[in-house]
Amino acid sequence: MAATGWRVKRGRKMLAAVVLQVLGRGLVAAARLDKRVRFEVASWPDPYTVTLMIAPWGPGVSWRRKGDTLACLGSTNVDCDLLVTFKSVDVALPTLLGAKGVLDALAEHRVMVKGDLTVAMVLVRCLNIVEGYLFPDIVTRRILPRPATRKRGHLVAYGALIHTEALIQVKARPTEETAA
């Protein structure tokens, strides 16, 4: 069978589903660890649901901001206020695996956005911070617009992946020095 057969496509979708679930919990973990993410998510309307998925019929992940909490809903089908869709699994994998940045994918029209574009840009900023926590420095130097600034280590971020909810109470906009 050719390298583009249905088995290969199914394997890519399964890999993308696993990475999306880690990314979903990674956003919640970053909201627990980093004031910048908490501030950005607190700027979303209340209540607000965001879904990141792969078209057509691909895997996805959803987050809901309700009150002072951000929750990862996993791959459940929910009515969302913002839908960010990768055009195919082949287009999504380089971004999800760290070969390309989220900003590059957006600039190269690899994703479609349905909903409020300002919230989509907030999501992109948050995902850049999440990638800074989850990917090693050698990868983040290549895909992030500026070097990742982490206030906690990789192991702490990986440990925070077990949580599916985070409190997002923020009083003021954090600066780079006080981002922890």
Where do the language-model regions lie?
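Feature captures hydrophobic
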Residues: 1-180
